[in-house]
Amino acid sequence: MRTPYLLALMVSLLPLKSMAQVAPDPLLASQIVDRYAEHIFYGSGATGMALVAIDGNQRVFASFGETRPGNNIRPQKDSLIRIASLSKLMTSEVMVKLAERGQIRLDDPLSKYAPPGARVPTYNGQPIRLINLSTHTSGLPREQPGGKAQRPVFVWPTKSERWAWLARANLKAAPGSSAAYSNLGYDLLSDALSRAAGTPYPALFQQLITRPLGMKDTTFTPSPEQCGRLMVAEKGASPCNNTLAAIGSGGVYSTPDDMGRWMQQFLNSSVNHRTPQIDRLQTLIYRRDQLNKVEGMDVPGKADALGMGWVFMGPKNGRPGIIQKTGGGGGFITYMAMVPQHNVGVFVVVTRSPLTRFTPMSDGVNNMLAELVGNQLGSPMMVQAIP
């Protein structure tokens, strides 16, 4: 009685075995990166580009163009860059780590950590909380009004100037009701974290972010030697100043190598294991449908959920769900995107020319991520965006 059943089972497995025998071997991550990186560079119209891709145990670096117009030197792993608004991800990391130490609560009101005598606006009695600052739901504007045109990036407003402005400000919406991108909010958040810890923010940043990962070139105050390595854009370049004024929102200088080290902590490999702490850093706080409106969050694609700096785009058109963050300033455009459950991530930085556009760069990175995921054995996703 068992024989027909076994024969039927064997016959049913034959096609699967046959398919397994002809299935192509997965490509090296470097082969996929090579296919996409040059297209991303030329599509973006950049002066120079550096890219770091991680796929499990594989880390790939690629670069194109020049570190400054006309010098014919490709960007290097240690070229100094501005990560711009990717700085916000590190500010949120400091916040989460202080919360784990018990030094703050994510739902603490900003007023708890305001300078003595400072006023923090509320909306019908609802306070701005730290979690609102980190999710762009504070009700504060994108920038503090009144900045001088053509000023260097990330040098205004200073700490005293933003708190003086805040004392006169009024909120137009309840915190937590809508999302509107706010650089000002993140600088106030870094001020609050420094006060809560009783430590200057640069020292806190070094203690919690850069020193544990060996990020030796990541700073707010680059040395003359580091400034000599700063990539320079054809359009929008800014002096290599200290950026302590924009310490929470966009002031971080770094290198592709340091950013690869930082990105690796979010992705499992044989030597790195994603921790529960890292899971908390990428917790999604608001679904889009929980908010009255969402402004300034859809640059590389529609934001379906917001985390603490991170933005999640759900699966679409053959692409997997992607968690990402964009940045730009001082002639730089940056983008970090990853699919953590598949241990793939990409960081890219470009310097601008008059022709530079963000979307061709981010679309190329998103397609590369999808193909890296599809290249993994057993994954159903595959994108062939470049023949």
Predicted feature descriptions by range:
Residues 26-81, 103:
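Short, conserved catalytic-motif segment at the N-terminal edge
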Residues 288-295, 301, 315, 352-387:
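Short, gly/Ser/Thr-rich active-site loops of penicillin-recognizing serine hydrolases
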Residues 324-325, 333-352:
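Short, well-ordered beta-strand elements
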Residues 34-37, 51, 57-59, 80-107, ...:
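Active-site SXXK
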Residues 15-17:
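N-terminal signal peptide c-region/cleavage motif recognized by signal peptidases
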Residues 68, 121-330:
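Short, surface-exposed loop or secondary-structure junction motifs
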Residues 1-6:
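Bacterial N-terminal signal peptides that target proteins for export
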